[in-house]
Curated annotation (Swiss-Prot):
The family this protein is said to belong to: Belongs to the ABC transporter superfamily. Arabinose importer (TC 3.A.1.2.2) family.
Subunit description: The complex is composed of two ATP-binding proteins (AraG), two transmembrane proteins (AraH) and a solute-binding protein (AraF).
Metal-binding keyword on record: no
Source organism per UniProt: Escherichia coli (strain K12)
Gene3D superfamilies in alphabetical order: P-loop containing nucleotide triphosphate hydrolases
Binding site for ATP: 40-47
One Pfam family cited in the UniProt record for this chain: ABC_tran
Identification of the protein by name: Arabinose import ATP-binding protein AraG
Ranges for domain ABC transporter: 8-243, 256-499
Signal sequence residues: none
GO BP terms: L-arabinose transmembrane transport
Keywords associated with the record: ATP-binding, Cell inner membrane, Cell membrane, Membrane, Nucleotide-binding, Repeat, Sugar transport, Translocase, Transport
Recorded GO CC terms: ATP-binding cassette (ABC) transporter complex, substrate-binding subunit-containing; cytosol; membrane; plasma membrane
Length: 504
């Protein structure tokens, strides 16, 4: 039952940066003993609001009210002293220090300038026990997993008696087991009567944890859902993007050209049986399958990331000898990999460099001098045309959201003479609005005659975007479905292991 008096309230919060209005008149309430989710596209204002709550930013207008008292935080220490803790995606801990030292950093128990280590470890042990964690407080943090680091961050908040704890995309680097443990801890914190704010783009997490959901769009408050029995995925999407769920995919029938890509009995590591399929110019073919189906392995083999062990790849009827990615690129075949952070972007380089790095070789001056004029124009063109949200072309790409990183990778391949594009989980970890933009890029590529082969474990996405769906099961093709005829039941039936295989 919702309490009558909120513990935390935002009253008319606005925040303006030079030339940018990040938040406008944000007002809503949060109650003790509840998990209150914040949702919205990237740039909707969620993180800015958390930074105001934590004392990183001062609001331009409005106020934060905690337990009936209007607060004005001059810095993060003031917010901590008021019982506010933020658990960010990038954890703020010191690897070389012990677990206990991290938990009580800034308030180490001491006497005469000497730290009382026995008391420090005892108190830290109590906080860890509170969270159900069996960790030696004297262990250097660097020896712990990311999930354990997160528990240390939460223990640090509890050591400061935080009554308001906000989590910002907390599961992005966690294993399934660590996510389950985090959810257990959050539910315990809720039982203790704390206010939990939870920011995530993963709707399954939102529905699993939340008692209320507030949606932001373009820096403005849209709506707060308080009856979780009456809210569903479609209602949240519509609130976030201002469109019905059917409009997100935007598929329309199109005509195709000649065969552009063909696989003839291709095998690669992780692909159990020879794979044969074709994609025509202007056609979008979706590869769907469960974990272990072999989708990513097939694409890596096609692109030269691993070696094709049998069969032949053809582009425009011509056999292509692909032993490494440069061979695929030279033939006009590009790949946006599943793990964009590890295999797609160069994190410590600029957006400009990440867009230009592949096509740069074609535009050098005198065979050896970088053509800065071309690079600036090319990067700026793709930043505008793909709506890449960045302060500028020189911004490090690691500082961009996942959706904008993916658009920069697409900009890289749009700088090349593309015939075929392979997209492996192109919208994983991307918010709904950015997904819509990625889909529009895919449709635009198809309209230009590019053959699109994209793999996704998101079945509604495959059914909503692809002209034809190829279903893979345990390293082989289990069947094909046309867009107009396909439904989730058919696709899942094809993707599920055969009974005899499952028993064996």
């Amino acid at each position: 039952m919702q309490q009558s008096t909120p513990y935390l309230s935002f009253r008319g919060i606005g925040k303006t940066f030079p030339g940018v209005k990040a938040l406008t008149d944000i007002s809503f309430d949060c109650y003790a003993g509840q998990v209150h989710a914040l949702m919205g596209e990237n740039g909707a204002g969620k993180s800015t609001l958390l930074k105001i709550l934590s004392g990183n930013y001062a609001p331009t207008t409005g106020s934060v009210v905690i337990n009936g008292q209007e607060m004005s935080f001059s810095d993060t220490t003031a917010a901590l002293n008021a019982g506010v803790a933020i658990i960010y995606q990038e954890l703020h801990l010191v690897p070389e220090m012990t677990v206990a030292e991290n938990i009580y950093l800034g308030q180490l128990p001491h006497k005469g300038g000497i730290v009382n280590r026995s008391l420090l470890n005892y108190e830290a042990g109590l906080q860890l026990k509170h969270l159900g964690m069996d960790i030696d407080p004297d262990t250097p943090l660097k020896y712990l997993s990311i999930g354990q680091w997160q528990m240390v961050e939460i223990a640090k908040a509890l050591a400061r008696n935080a009554k308001i704890i906000a989590f910002d995309e907390p599961t992005s680097s966690l294993s399934a087991r660590e996510i389950d443990n985090l959810f257990r801890v959050i539910r315990e914190l809720r039982k203790e009567g704390r206010v939990i704010l939870y920011v995530s783009h993963r709707m399954e997490e939102i529905f699993a944890l939340s008692d209320a959901i507030t949606v932001f769009k373009d820096g403005r408050y849209v709506k707060t859902f308080t009856d979780m029995q009456q809210v569903d995925h479609d209602a949240l999407v519509q609130a976030m993007v201002g469109r019905d769920i059917g409009d997100i995919y935007g598929w329309q029938p199109r005509s195709y050209g000649e065969e552009r890509l063909r696989l003839d009995a291709v095998k690669a590591p992780g692909v159990r049986t020879p794979i044969s399929l074709a994609v025509r110019s202007g056609e979008i073919v979706g590869l769907f399958g469960l974990v272990g189906a072999g989708r990513s392995e097939l694409m890596k083999g096609m692109f030269g990331g691993t070696q094709i062990t049998a069969g032949q790849v053809y582009i425009d009827q011509q056999p292509i000898d692909i032993r490494k990615p440069s061979h695929a690129i030279a033939a006009g075949m590009m790949l946006c990999p599943e793990d964009r952070k590890a295999e797609g972007i160069i994190p410590v380089h600029s957006v400009r460099d990440n867009i230009n790095i592949s096509a740069r070789r074609k535009h050098v001056l005198g065979g050896c001098v970088i053509n800065n004029g071309w690079e600036e124009n090319n990067a700026d063109h793709h930043i505008r045309s793909l709506n890449i949200k960045t302060p500028g072309a020189e911004q490090l790409i690691m500082n961009l959201s996942g959706g904008n990183q993916q658009k920069a990778i697409l900009g890289r391949w749009l700088s090349e003479e593309m015939k075929v594009i392979l997209l492996d989980e192109p919208t994983r970890g991307i918010d709904v609005g950015a997904k819509h933009e990625i889909y529009n890029v895919i449709y635009a590529l198809a309209a230009q005659g590019v053959a699109v082969l994209f793999a996704s474990s998101d079945l509604p996405e495959v059914l909503g975007v692809a002209d034809r769906i190829v279903v893979m099961r345990e390293g082989e093709i289990a069947g094909e479905l046309l867009h107009e005829q396909a439904d989730e039941r058919q696709a899942l039936s094809l993707a599920m292991p055969k009974v005899s295989q499952a028993v064996a």
